[in-house]
Amino acid sequence: MIKIERQTKETDIVVELNVDGKGKSDIDTGIGFFDHMLESFAKHARFDVKVVCKGDIHVDFHHSVEDVGIVLGQAFYQSVFPVHNKERFGDAVIVMDESAVECAIDLSNRPFLVYEVDIDGTIGQFDAELIEEFFRAFVFNARITAHIIQKRGKNRHHLAEASFKALAVALRRALAEDKRAGMPSTKGVL
């Protein structure tokens, strides 16, 4: 279990992460829809995740969403690197009713995000553009490469949830044990 705390003038965050968990979550960011996405992420990655965030949500949700991504990404990095005896690559296509989102990842230690999901507007009170902000913060702090691409769909909630689940399942698959892999790079280091 990795525990990271981060305090700024905008947020006060505590994250606990066990990547070898069972998908249990205890999420409290004060942002209902975001909590739902993080719970779904934990469940489908099979990570045990605890997140407590006290943020300036009276201003808007941006600082809380981005900062949770930063801290969760840092916890993931500390949990996984250096990568050894793992598949390293993972992918998933997740459908939710009319929506389908694909995610492919590489535990590369080279952060890069391709995000091509067309979600404009709001989901309840949640600004949908914050989904990309979360993924960018997570990916860059986890030091992974992720491509999250919409295959079809138009319902904002479905696209968002399929995106979080696709990342979760791709991560679970990339973390699958492969004792033959050793250091899964021809460079000898990731």
From Swiss-Prot:
Listed under GO cellular component are: cytoplasm
What catalytic activity is recorded?
D-erythro-1-(imidazol-4-yl)glycerol 3-phosphate = 3-(imidazol-4-yl)-2-oxopropyl phosphate + H2O
Name the Gene3D superfamilies for this protein: Imidazole glycerol phosphate dehydratase, domain 1 (3.30.230.40)
Cited CDD domains:
IGPD
Q: State which Enzyme Commission number(s) the record gives.
A: 4.2.1.19
Instruction: Tell me where it mainly resides.
Output: cytoplasm
GO BP terms, alphabetized:
L-histidine biosynthetic process
The alphabetical list of record keywords is: Amino-acid biosynthesis, Cytoplasm, Histidine biosynthesis, Lyase
Query: Where in the cell is the protein located?
Result: Cytoplasm
> Which pathway does the record list?
Amino-acid biosynthesis; L-histidine biosynthesis; L-histidine from 5-phospho-alpha-D-ribose 1-diphosphate: step 6/9
Question: Which major enzyme category is it?
Answer: lyase
**Pfam families xrefs:** IGPD
One GO term in the molecular function aspect is: imidazoleglycerol-phosphate dehydratase activity
Sorted alphabetically, which InterPro entries does this protein's record hold? IGPD_sf, ImidazoleglycerolP_deHydtase, ImidazoleglycerP_deHydtase_CS, Ribosomal_Su5_D2-typ_SF
Similarity section: Belongs to the imidazoleglycerol-phosphate dehydratase family.
Designated name of the protein: Imidazoleglycerol-phosphate dehydratase
Which species is the source of this protein? Nitratiruptor sp. (strain SB155-2)
Please spell out the taxonomic lineage of the organism that makes this protein. Bacteria, Pseudomonadati, Campylobacterota, Epsilonproteobacteria, Nautiliales
Q: What's the encoding gene here?
A: hisB
